[in-house]
From Swiss-Prot:
Region (Phosphoribosyl-ATP pyrophosphohydrolase): 115-215
The protein's enzyme class: hydrolase
Keyword match Nucleotide-binding: yes
Gene: hisI
Keyword ATP-binding on entry: yes
UniProtKB keywords: Amino-acid biosynthesis, ATP-binding, Cytoplasm, Histidine biosynthesis, Hydrolase, Multifunctional enzyme, Nucleotide-binding
Disulphide-bridged cysteine pairs: none
Catalytic activity: 1-(5-phospho-beta-D-ribosyl)-ATP + H2O = 1-(5-phospho-beta-D-ribosyl)-5'-AMP + diphosphate + H(+); 1-(5-phospho-beta-D-ribosyl)-5'-AMP + H2O = 1-(5-phospho-beta-D-ribosyl)-5-[(5-phospho-beta-D-ribosylamino)methylideneamino]imidazole-4-carboxamide
Subcellular localization, as worded in the UniProt entry: Cytoplasm
Pathway participation: Amino-acid biosynthesis; L-histidine biosynthesis; L-histidine from 5-phospho-alpha-D-ribose 1-diphosphate: step 2/9; Amino-acid biosynthesis; L-histidine biosynthesis; L-histidine from 5-phospho-alpha-D-ribose 1-diphosphate: step 3/9
Gene Ontology terms for molecular function: ATP binding; phosphoribosyl-AMP cyclohydrolase activity; phosphoribosyl-ATP diphosphatase activity
Lineage: Bacteria, Pseudomonadati, Pseudomonadota, Gammaproteobacteria, Enterobacterales
Region described as Phosphoribosyl-AMP cyclohydrolase: spans on this chain: 1-114
Protein name listed in UniProt: Histidine biosynthesis bifunctional protein HisIE
């Protein structure tokens, strides 16, 4: 988190007393939006824990979500190497874009961010039971049934691969990942923790290889 005294170290001169701010989802790493802050906006952001921008058209502060309720809860604030741009990691409380999208940056590419959106739906089905939801029925049946489904889908994925059936492999892999995410949330975990663990393993492997090169 950026400390309050660090305000003095930021370069406010390049854009007439303002600093560009990039807002990024802390969980999915999706870039949500871009805005500007002056010193008052940054101070308010740090004090309230909610992202507040400076409107260049209205010449006033505005807290994201003050009308829609879709606030951006601050997780971490960092600066770039030139101290003239901020990156704020947030937990978005609803849709960030006024068009109803999670991000103001529209992309037609499907990526891992979709997996995190799927997680949101799965978590909602876990907490709010629906008679018409297959996911809710899994949680109602309990951990044993969910774990069994993961095992079944894993076997079917293996069989599809052994049969060289690419279309079936994609279908079965999709089922496997879905049920695995359901199981993770059943244990109050999420896929982001898995990604973090993979990153740690990768870093450990790189460090080990570097040590070998030095010997």
């Amino acid at each position: 988190m950026l400390k309050k005294h660090d305000l003095l170290n930021l370069d406010w001169t390049k854009t007439n007393g303002m600093i560009p701010v990039i807002i990024q989802d802390y969980s999915s790493s999706e870039v949500l939006m871009h805005g500007y802050m002056n010193q008052d906006a940054l101070t308010k952001t740090q004090e309230d824990g909610l992202v507040t921008f400076y409107s260049r058209t209205k010449n006033c502060l505005w807290t994201k979500g003050e009308i829609s309720g879709n606030y951006l809860k601050v997780i971490e604030i960092s600066t770039d190497c030139d101290n003239d741009t901020l990156l704020i990691l947030v937990a978005a409380q609803g849709k960030t874009c006024h068009l109803g999208n999670s991000s103001c940056f529209i992309s037609n590419k499907y990526n891992i961010n979709f997996l995190f959106k799927l997680e949101e739906i799965i978590e909602e089905r876990k907490n709010k039971f629906s008679d018409n939801s297959y996911t809710s029925s899994l949680y109602k049946s309990g951990t044993s049934r969910i774990a069994q489904k993961v095992g079944e889908e894993a076997i079917e994925t293996i069989l599809a691969a052994m049969n060289k059936d690419q279309i079936e492999l994609i279908n079965e892999a999709s089922d496997l990942i879905y049920h695995l995410v359901v199981l993770l949330h059943d244990q109050d975990l999420n896929f982001n923790l898995v990604i973090d663990n993979l990153k740690k393993r990768r870093e450990k492997n790189l460090n080990t290889n570097s040590e070998k090169l030095l010997k």
